[in-house]
Design a protein with these regions (language model features):
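Extracytoplasmic
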Residues: 12, 67-69, 75-77, 161, ...
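Signature of long, low-cysteine stretches enriched in small and polar/charged residues
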Residues: 2-19, 25, 132-191, 206
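N-terminal "mature-domain start" segment
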Residues: 55-84
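Surface-exposed amphipathic alpha-helical segments
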Residues: 28-52, 74, 80, 193-210
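Secretory pathway targeting signatures of secreted, lumenal, and periplasmic proteins
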Residues: 77-136, 171
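A short, polar/proline- and glycine-enriched secondary-structure boundary/capping micro-motif
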Residues: 101-104, 177, 206-209
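Short, well-ordered beta-strand elements
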Residues: 14-26, 105-109, 192-202
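Solvent-exposed alpha-helical segments and adjacent loops
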Residues: 1-60
Length: 210
């Protein structure tokens, strides 16, 4: 079997992957062996598409706020204007009209001490403490927490610096709300801190993608 791809053959932006195999059995075997490569290919293509879109149109309000608070350049889709600010914490959200869907971005930071700062357990502990303080529910005793049974982490590097990704599920303590989240944490060595950017969704009736 052979795998090849082409860019912008019939439209733009567009990525096409073609797999050639002599028969169905060898095709199935090839896909099973290379499924992660295939998924990563389209995931990266979609990420690049979103990045190019955000270069043209983004929330200038949130970009300016993140820049002043954290010294970071963060661009999120236009339409995110309202926000809640705390100590080393910023939360912006957008509710979809006519639905229960709520899209959210959070940025927060905390001191970088050593490599243990990036362990799975430490991340969950730190996330829970930050969210409990800054994202309470509508009633007393309600606050956001992490479902520790469903947190997957991945280490990688950005421009030679250590970075950490966590994907999992959040829930509202003493409430029925919950949904998926994705967090990216990076070391900011000049300022001796870790900066976390997170997206989380509340969409009880809709399917969620990566």
């Amino acid at each position: 079997p052979k795998l090849k791809y082409s860019r912008d053959s019939y439209s733009s932006p567009q990525m096409i992957m073609t797999i050639q195999a002599p028969d169905e059995a060898s095709f199935e075997e090839f896909v099973n062996k290379n499924k992660q490569v295939i998924v990563d290919f389209f995931t990266k293509a979609e990420m690049n598409r979103q990045i190019n879109l955000l270069k043209k149109e983004y929330s200038s309000v949130i970009a300016a706020k993140v820049g002043s608070m954290f010294g970071c350049d963060l661009r999120i889709p236009a339409g995110f204007e309202r926000y809640k600010q705390g100590k080393d914490f910023l939360w912006t959200s957008q509710d979809r009209p006519g639905s229960e869907v709520s899209l959210n971005f959070v940025v927060y930071s905390y001191p970088y001490t050593d490599k243990n700062t990036f362990t799975r357990d430490y991340f969950i502990h730190k996330r829970d403490s930050v969210m409990k303080l800054n994202i309470p529910g509508s009633l007393e005793g309600q606050y956001m927490a992490t479902d520790s049974n469903y947190v997957n982490v991945k280490e990688f590097s950005v421009k030679g610096e250590y970075a950490f990704e966590a994907r999992g599920l959040w829930y509202m303590e003493n409430d029925m709300m919950g949904g998926p989240f994705v967090s990216h944490a990076r070391v900011d060595r000049p300022n001796g801190r870790v900066v976390v950017v997170e997206a989380f969704v509340y969409a009880p009736k809709d399917k969620k993608r990566d």
